[in-house]
Amino acid sequence: MQNLQIREKLALDIILFGKICFPNMFSTESPPFHYEIAALLQDSNNNKLNIIAPRGHAKSSLIACVFPIWHMLTQEGPKFIVLSSKTEGHAVRLLQTIKNALEYSAELRSIYGYWGQHSAKQWARTEIVLKDDTMIMCR
């Protein structure tokens, strides 16, 4: 399968995007509710969502890491993404997960090119500005 075909397929499926680009985050089978969340996230009619699930069910991995990167790489134009959490420390950890994924995922790099620190316009503790002017910040 050629790179463009892979990108087109991944643009339609957040879970598949995560499994391919971040295999270490998807080491077990995704439960059915992850597919429900993904469908809600992919529906452009939903501009506000409140997802509630027990601790340890990979909500943050899917919603605060995989989805922002998927959205950034599969939808046109620069994005403004705010990682909001109860504490700034938790939001910073979420951003660090994104930064690690952008910097170190060989799978992501092979499909979308390099999006890590050396191509970014800003790469700070609480915010990053990527090469396409997408900004991801903590609050």
Task: Describe the function of each predicted region.
Residues 1-47:
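N-terminal accessory segments
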Residues 48-50, 80-82, 135:
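Residue-level preference for the first positions of well-ordered beta-strands
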Residues 45-46, 77-78, 131-133:
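Short, well-ordered loop/turn elements at secondary-structure boundaries
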Residues 35-42, 61-73:
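Contiguous, well-ordered alpha-helical segments that form the cores/surfaces of helical PPI scaffolds
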Residues 46-68:
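Walker A/P-loop
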Residues 57-63, 73-80, 85:
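Alpha-helix boundary/capping segments in eukaryotic regulatory proteins
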Residues 84-137:
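Conserved nucleotide-state-sensing and coupling region of NTP-binding domains
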